[in-house]
From Swiss-Prot:
Name of this chain's protein: Heat shock protein homolog SSE1
Originating gene: SSE1
Gene3D superfamilies recorded: 1.20.1270.10, 3.30.30.30, 3.30.420.40, Actin, Chain A, domain 4, Substrate Binding Domain Of DNAk, Chain A, domain 1
Chain intervals with Low complexity compositional bias: 664-674
GO molecular function, one term: peptide binding
Keyword terms of this UniProt record: ATP-binding, Chaperone, Cytoplasm, Nucleotide-binding, Stress response
Similarity section: Belongs to the heat shock protein 70 family.
InterPro entries xrefs: ATPase_NBD, HSP70_C_sf, HSP70_peptide-bd_sf, Hsp_70_fam
UniProt KW Endoplasmic reticulum keyword: no
Pfam families noted in UniProt: HSP70
Biased composition (Basic and acidic residues): 675-691
Biological process according to GO: autophagy; proteasomal ubiquitin-independent protein catabolic process; proteasome-mediated ubiquitin-dependent protein catabolic process; protein folding; protein refolding
Length: 697
């Protein structure tokens, strides 16, 4: 069975967690880091995923795609696109479906991949990291995404997981996942009729800021309000610092880092480190060697100067707090605790502003970097048939009202508000319509004027067929089960026609009726299910044929990555064998090879080395294996002789040690027997003297 996996899909880095019988663990990656860079790099033969991509980002800047969370499911025509493009060094393009893709040079040619594809590449790497660490099968995942993701973005994230070979059992809001982590592991939550504990969660990460208000009782969580600022995060601080130094270096060193993508990236990376240093210190130096044109730059920044640079951002700190409280219909005084998560909340001026907004001290009982992933792993475990977890129920909140629209046939109305703003989900509503034939239904946001710019009004559309009107009737009642599922997707779960039939129903006997009285019946009308209708959904999810094609493509790329890695490993093994064997041939192995063998093998090693740095520099896995086996055919014979002699020496040494131990033991036993004999003789002599004594008393 699959190990429950929670993925905190972060913009700068992602955190991976798994649920096991002993609890929830964070999974470390191949370099033992507890988070993995969320990016994908493209090279001449293979991709560089996560840590590998980060290591090559500066040298491969135009072919490395980061900020994945920001472009998944986003339309190229969306008003956010221009803002997002500022943070990309790779070229963003418009795909055929209107979504965003990235153009990179890969495998020697220009190629375009959709944002969903690239996110899937990263998620596949995350899956591999978990499988390598746990040595288990991983398919089920709870995917933590921003609360500001619309339906299209949530579907795109789920599709990315599917392309990566994962089954997204739930797409959950990231701050809600952190709240679940809080609720599951807190042992002092109120119970029964006690007043619920109200906790505000403030998450400021790399690219966005979310505030959610949760109401807790033991085993229960209800999100009361959520608000956010999509363009307020650590990267905005980094960019402000970078722009400050760009202007300074332009005047001081006569260089413009804005004209050089690599230089700009290096300064922004250094700016991120400087920001972290200034969270603990009031001032810090800023130095980069050969940033561009062989120019070394040097400067410094104080915490006070940083706060001046980000003053426009700081003015927006309280807005999400105010909106979340308003949606929850609460005041700051109603909040019991304020939990902060996300790396950017470590900045002192932000902590002070958040504390002032709630007029209370901040709590850090949650791990700021790992709470979301742990909550997601627990949520995935809830869906596991094999892992038993403590009962915990949680509900999220509809930010916008959703109505369902239908073809007007019999009814006066052609739509109904089904899921009001502020209502909880998952939620199900059953409605009845009178239909004259097949029809379509559409889910739309009720008040499009309140939606963020660029957000589509339409959510989904369904074609409902198989409607049969009884002879002599003008319409037939159709029942529809409308649902907002646990992932926040709006669906029609089922649809069927109903009919009224007359049945006989027994009348309960009177209290004074005799026991042997004949039962009496009455005729009643009952509504029963008649025909199940067919539903064809048109959502933002990828069509099955397209999804399968992308899955196949990802599997091919993953196989190519694996082949390249194995080929490089074989090449390194061959190279190491050449150098190691050459060194040992004149030393340890010298006595175990004839002069003829030495000459022959040295010649083979020289030719292999020459081949490695010439035509074999970029060869195939099979050729590296063949070259290795050719050398090993003689080298391993000599090594075998050496190992046999070494084993003989070890056996001789072991025999000598055992003989010495036996001799030592025999000597000890002999000494022990001699001591015992002497003691017996001494005792006998003593007893003899005692027999000759005369008692004068």
């Amino acid at each position: 069975m699959s190990i429950p996996f929670g993925l905190d899909f972060g913009n700068n880095s992602s955190v991976l967690a798994v649920a096991r019988n002993r609890g929830i663990d964070i999974v470390v990656n191949e370099v033992s880091n507890r988070s993995t860079p969320s990016l994908v790099g493209f090279g001449q033969k293979n991709r560089f995923l996560g840590e590998a991509g980060k290591n090559k980002q500066t040298s491969n800047i135009k072919n490395t795609v980061d900020n994945l969370k920001r472009i998944v499911g986003l339309d190229h025509a969306h008003s956010d696109f221009e803002e997002e493009a500022k943070f990309f060094s790779s070229k963003l393009v418009k795909m055929e479906d209107g979504k965003i893709g990235a153009q990179v040079r890969f495998a020697g040619e220009q190629q375009v991949f959709s944002a969903t594809q690239i996110a899937a590449m990263f998620m596949n790497r995350a899956k591999t990291i978990v499988q390598d660490e746990t040595k288990g099968k991983v398919t089920d995942v709870a995917l933590a995404v921003p609360a500001w993701y619309n339906e299209a973005q949530r579907y795109a994230a789920a599709d990315a997981a599917r392309i990566a070979g994962l089954n997204p059992v739930r797409v959950v809001n990231d701050v809600t996942a952190a709240a679940v982590s809080y609720g599951v592991f807190k042992t002092d939550l109120p119970e029964g009729e006690e007043k619920p504990r109200r906790v505000a969660f403030v998450d400021i990460g790399h690219s966005s800021y979310t505030c959610s208000i949760g109401s807790f009782k033991k085993g229960e969580l209800k999100i009361l309000g959520t608000a956010y600022d999509k363009h307020f995060g650590g990267r905005n601080f980094d960019r402000a610092i970078t722009e400050h130094f760009a202007e300074e270096f332009k005047g001081k060193y006569k260089i413009d880092i804005r004209e050089n993508a690599k230089a700009y990236n290096r300064v922004m990376t250094a700016a991120e480190k400087l920001k972290k240093v200034l969270s603990a210190n009031t001032a810090a130096p800023f130095n980069i060697e050969s940033v561009m044109n062989d120019v070394d730059v040097s400067s410094q920044l104080t915490r006070e100067e940083l706060e001046e640079l980000v003053a426009p951002l700081l003015k927006r700190v309280t807005e999400p707090v105010t909106k979340a409280l308003a949606q929850a219909k609460l005041t700051p005084e109603d909040i019991d605790f304020v939990e902060i998560i996300g790396g950017t909340t470590r900045i002192p001026c932000l902590k002070n502003a958040i504390s002032a907004a709630f007029n209370k001290p901040l709590s850090t009982t949650l791990n700021q970097d790992e709470a979301i992933a742990k909550g997601a792993a627990f949520i995935c475990a809830i869906h596991s048939p094999t892992l038993k977890v403590r009962p915990f129920k949680f509900e999220d909140i509809h930010e916008y009202s959703v109505s369902y629209h239908w073809d007007q046939q019999v009814e006066d109305e052609d739509h109904l508000e089904v899921f009001p703003a502020g209502s909880s989900y998952p939620s199900t509503k059953l409605i009845t319509l009178h239909r004259t034939g097949d029809f379509t239904m559409t889910a739309k946001y009720t008040n499009p004027e309140v939606l963020p710019a660029g957000m589509p009004e339409e959510i989904a559309k369904w074609e409902i067929t198989g409607v049969k009107v009884p002879e002599g009737e003008t319409s037939v009642p159709v029942k529809l089960k409308l649902r907002c599922d646990p992932s926040g997707f709006h669906i029609i779960e089922n649809a069927y026609t109903v009919e009224d039939i007359k049945v006989k129903e027994q009348i309960p006997p009177a209290a004074d009726a005799p026991e042997d009285a004949e039962p009496e019946y009455k005729e009643v009308t009952k509504t029963v299910k008649k025909d199940t209708l067919q539903i064809v959904a048109h959502t933002f999810a990828l069509e099955e044929a397209v999804l399968n094609e992308l899955i196949e493509k990802e599997n091919e790329l993953a196989a190519q990555d694996k082949l390249v890695a194995e080929t490089e490993d074989r090449k390194n093994t061959l190279e190491e064998y050449v150098y190691t064997l050459r060194g040992k041939l004149d030393e340890e192995y010298a006595a175990f090879a004839s002069d003829e063998e030495k000459t022959k093998l040295k010649d083979m090693l020289a030719k292999a080395e020459e081949w490695l740095y010439d035509e074999g520099y970029d060869s195939t896995k099979a050729k590296y294996i063949a070259k290795y086996e050719e050398l090993a055919s003689l080298g391993n014979v000599i090594r075998g002789r050496y190992m046999a002699k070494e084993e003989e020496k070890r056996q001789a040494l072991r025999a000598k040690q055992e003989a010495a131990q036996m001799a030592e033991m025999a000597e000890k036993l002999a000494a022990q027997r001699a001591a015992e004999q002497k003691a017996q003789e001494s005792k006998a002599e003593s007893d003899k003297d005692a027999e000759g004594d005369i008692d004068l008393d």
